[in-house]
Amino acid sequence: MIHHLSIAARDPQHVACVLAELMGGKAVPFPPNPGSFFALQLDEYGSGVEVYPAGTELQPGGTTGGSFVKKEARGYGPTHFALSVTTDADKVEAIAARAGWQCFCCNRGPFHVIEVWVENESMVEILPPEFAREYLAFTRPDKVTAAMTAASPATARHRAT
């Protein structure tokens, strides 16, 4: 179980507030890294997303723990995550539109997601309840391995640059 993860954003407070709204939770400052915020889902699992200033790197620090180092912002990258929410699809799209973020309802074959492009650079796959049910049915241990093994490279979403 993943309890929390971190992403970078150009406006961490705004991003954390929007993510918290999508989750039905709350955004709070994240003191270990000044300028960062924590979008809390406020569920029994401690689920949340730490949002750091763009360019932040987490580097090893031995037994005292990792340290935060500020570098240059990067833009697009491969990191993304799927986030189940209790918010319905229409409200997800409205929240993304109000934030000025691109948002697309996508069919992944066995399940659907709403791609919300945080600051129009980083993707979060939002799973409203009906999409979460599809996703969980697909990712059951008895199904997901066989499905991934049988998948054809022809179904890849790779785009030449």
Q: Where are the language model's segments positioned?
A:
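Conserved short beta-strand elements that form part of the metal-binding/catalytic scaffold
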Residues: K26-E72, H112-L136
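Core segments of cupin and vicinal oxygen chelate
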Residues: I7-T56, A94, R98-F111, P141-K143, ...
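Short secondary-structure transition/capping segments
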Residues: E72-T86, L127-L136, T149-T161
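Generic structural hydrophobic/aromatic packing signal, biased to beta-strands
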Residues: V51, F81-L83, E93-A96, C103, ...
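Vicinal oxygen chelate
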Residues: I2-A9, Q41, G62-D90, I114-V116
